[in-house]
Amino acid sequence: MEKLEKLISTYENYPKAGVSFKDVIEIVQHPSIFRQLILEMAKSKIIKEAEALISIDARGFIFGSAISIQAAKPMIVARKPGKLPGELVTKKYSLEYGENSLSIQKKALKKYNSFAIIDDLLATGGTVNCVSELINNNNKKVVGLLVVAELSKFDGRSRFNFPVESSILF
């Protein structure tokens, strides 16, 4: 999707020095392109094989919600600290530019056995690895990952034993 690539901006030294941040948010300002992206992502074999989607805080929610509606699949969320009520499963992880943790509500995780992970971007794979470990540690299965953009120089996909699909490869 050539038009899609032109809508992804690069911000140097954000959120810290040495990081080249790819921002996919402009895609949602172009409804016809956004719609086409969601239609394509929702057709994925990964989505068809999953019982539910797990979208990652926060930009993953944008794409995950739209895919969830299009594919008629339930969506649960992996959130940053302090953002979810109730009993949680939580894991820390390292980022390209720091450390964080993600949580998933236990009751949401218990309802389904197989998940497609949805996020905006794959770089080192730290965030996705955190979510996949949360899923696997609860005797559930990750059937694959869908991202809008992938930064191939980080080879994040090599960390996973499940399929990875990206709409744009940088």
From Swiss-Prot:
Pathway membership: Purine metabolism; AMP biosynthesis via salvage pathway; AMP from adenine: step 1/1
UniProt subcellular location: Cytoplasm
Organism of this sequence: Prochlorococcus marinus (strain MIT 9312)
Chief place where the protein resides: cytoplasm
Matching HAMAP family: Aden_phosphoribosyltr
Keyword rRNA-binding: no
Protein name: Adenine phosphoribosyltransferase
Function (record text): Catalyzes a salvage reaction resulting in the formation of AMP, that is energically less costly than de novo synthesis.
Subunit note: Homodimer.
Pfam families in alphabetical order: Pribosyltran
Gene Ontology MF terms in the entry: adenine binding; adenine phosphoribosyltransferase activity; AMP binding
Family: Belongs to the purine/pyrimidine phosphoribosyltransferase family.
A Gene Ontology BP annotation from the UniProt entry: AMP salvage
Record EC number: 2.4.2.7
Catalytic reaction list: AMP + diphosphate = 5-phospho-alpha-D-ribose 1-diphosphate + adenine
Assigned GO CC terms: cytoplasm
